[in-house]
Regions:
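Small-molecule kinase domains that catalyze NTP-dependent phosphoryl transfer to phosphate-bearing small molecules
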Residues: 66, 77, 122-129, 136, ...
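Hydrophobic anchor at the beta1->P-loop junction of P-loop NTPases
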Residues: 9
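Hydrophobic positions on the alpha1 helix immediately C-terminal to the Walker A/P-loop
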Residues: 20
Length: 228
């Protein structure tokens, strides 16, 4: 087996990482892997099995005892033209975007054993695949030797509106609550002891605050084509 080309995309929550990664993957015919979805799937498992809840966030450590019961896979959905995530054989692409998962995922993602469990799976995907992988530690931990590293940023208000628009049931929360949650997640992601979110020295920073999708992708594809 050979390792393919790797494009690593990191950044804070709701900066548009996955949208950018999907677009690059389609353009280059690479495999797209949303690692944030993998952490969300583990979090969803914890909720479904009554291991963690809003009132018992710190119980997330108990999920470590159930990792051998968790199988995460990606399958291509032709009608949506994207890879979708499956948890133990069930499509959970929509369920992992719920506010309950959003509020708990950072507590799950900071646990070293869970990160190691998922990082190993992420590295395996690079064998015999050219991939675009987005997350928070792709360039720094998962693939420090990636062929190209991008770090995506965006204004907090823009990010909050983007996340709010993604939610199917907006009655669950308000825009201001979403923004507060994002800021809290930023602090958790940057401050965790294991694999904190950092911008690598060799990463190219892209601001996705107030730019059209067309202009953004034209700029990014120029960078990609010069590096890959």
């Amino acid at each position: 087996m050979e390792k393919g080309k790797i494009i690593a995309i990191d950044g804070f929550s709701s900066t548009g990482k996955s949208t950018i990664a999907k677009a690059i993957a389609r353009e280059l015919n690479f495999l797209h892997v949303d690692t944030g979805a993998m952490y969300r799937a583990v979090t969803l498992y914890g909720i479904q099995e009554n291991i963690i809840s809003e009132n018992d966030k710190e119980n997330a450590l108990q999920i470590v005892n159930h990792l051998d019961e968790i199988q995460i896979t990606f399958r291509y959905n032709e009608s949506e033209n994207q890879n979708e995530i499956y948890l133990n054989g069930q499509n959970v692409e929509n369920e992992i975007r719920s506010i309950s998962v959003t509020n708990l995922v950072s507590y799950v993602a900071k646990i070293p054993e869970i990160r190691s469990f998922l990082v190993e799976q992420q590295r395996q995907l690079a064998w015999n695949h050219n991939i675009v992988m987005d997350g928070r530690d792709i360039g720094s931990v998962v693939f420090p030797q990636a062929d190209l590293k991008l770090f995506i940023t965006a204004d907090a208000q823009v990010r909050a509106q983007r996340r709010f628009n993604e939610m199917e049931d907006k009655s669950e929360t308000t825009l201001e609550e979403v923004k507060a949650n994002l800021i809290q997640r930023d602090e958790l992601d940057s401050g965790r002891e294991n694999s904190p979110l950092v911008k690598c020295d060799d990463a190219i920073e892209i601001d996705n605050s107030n730019v059209s999708q067309e202009e953004l992708m034209e700029n990014i594809m120029r960078i990609v084509q010069s590096k890959i």
